[in-house]
């Protein structure tokens, strides 16, 4: 994964710089998300790793994407095809989203709880994270009964494990040492 990120980073950064310059960050995010989905398609996978000439591969990829990709996006696809990098489009899209969130002072937080959270609880978590991170927070909530009770919050590098399962695990480690 780290290798894919290293390969994808210059493409994502270049795309982000162009998007900011042309005030089209959301448009680029949509284009890259769509292109990433196309590159992950099981029909497209063999073509990306095959021996098809880069110009033909780029033309095929662009025709599959149709009007979902503008001229600047098509140029990115052509450059990536020339360098044999179309298979890293999902990583480019992911990095672009990270750059976008950083630029917009936003962060996505994954919240896993033992039971469904009420809208009031979600708002409390969101407000607390916004204060702590000094960013606008978008919550992605899910449930996992294995937590027993409590929540686990992941926002960027920050991980807060307030679950009973986590507390039991830490207690067990202390007792064994």
UniProtKB/Swiss-Prot annotation:
Pfam families listed in its UniProt record: OSCP
Any GO molecular function: proton-transporting ATP synthase activity, rotational mechanism
Membrane-topology annotation of the record: Peripheral membrane protein
Subcellular compartments: Cell inner membrane
Gene Ontology cellular-component annotations: plasma membrane; proton-transporting ATP synthase complex
Keywords from the UniProt entry: ATP synthesis, Cell inner membrane, Cell membrane, CF(1), Hydrogen ion transport, Ion transport, Membrane, Transport
Alphabetized Gene3D superfamilies for the sequence: N-terminal domain of the delta subunit of the F1F0-ATP synthase
Record note on quaternary structure: F-type ATPases have 2 components, F(1) - the catalytic core - and F(0) - the membrane proton channel. F(1) has five subunits: alpha(3), beta(3), gamma(1), delta(1), epsilon(1). F(0) has three main subunits: a(1), b(2) and c(10-14). The alpha and beta chains form an alternating ring which encloses part of the gamma chain. F(1) is attached to F(0) by a central stalk formed by the gamma and epsilon chains, while a peripheral stalk is formed by the delta and b chains.
HAMAP family from the UniProt entry: ATP_synth_delta_bact
NCBIfam families (alphabetical): ATP_synt_delta, PRK05758.2-2, PRK05758.2-5
Function: F(1)F(0) ATP synthase produces ATP from ADP in the presence of a proton or sodium gradient. F-type ATPases consist of two structural domains, F(1) containing the extramembraneous catalytic core and F(0) containing the membrane proton channel, linked together by a central stalk and a peripheral stalk. During catalysis, ATP synthesis in the catalytic domain of F(1) is coupled via a rotary mechanism of the central stalk subunits to proton translocation. This protein is part of the stalk that links CF(0) to CF(1). It either transmits conformational changes from CF(0) to CF(1) or is implicated in proton conduction.
Family: Belongs to the ATPase delta chain family.
Name of the molecule in the record: ATP synthase subunit delta
Protein's organism: Shewanella sp. (strain MR-7)
Gene (name only): atpH
């Amino acid at each position: 994964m780290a290798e894919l990120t290293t390969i994808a980073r210059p493409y994502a950064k270049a795309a982000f710089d162009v998007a900011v310059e042309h005030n089209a960050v959301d448009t680029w995010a949509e284009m890259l998300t769509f292109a990433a989905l196309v590159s992950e398609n099981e029909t497209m996978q063999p073509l990306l790793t095959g021996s098809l000439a880069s110009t033909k591969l780029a033309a095929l990829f662009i025709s599959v994407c149709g009007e979902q990709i503008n001229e600047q996006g098509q140029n990115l696809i052509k450059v990536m095809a020339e360098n044999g990098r179309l298979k890293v489009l999902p990583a480019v899209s992911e990095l672009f989203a990270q750059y976008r969130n950083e630029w917009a002072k936003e962060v996505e937080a994954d919240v896993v709880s033992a039971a469904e959270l009420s809208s009031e609880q979600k708002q409390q978590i969101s407000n607390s994270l916004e204060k702590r991170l000094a960013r606008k927070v978008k919550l992605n909530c899910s449930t996992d009964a294995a937590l027993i009770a409590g929540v686990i919050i992941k926002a960027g590098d920050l991980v807060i494990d307030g679950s009973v399962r986590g507390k039991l695990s830490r207690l067990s480690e202390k007792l064994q040492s």
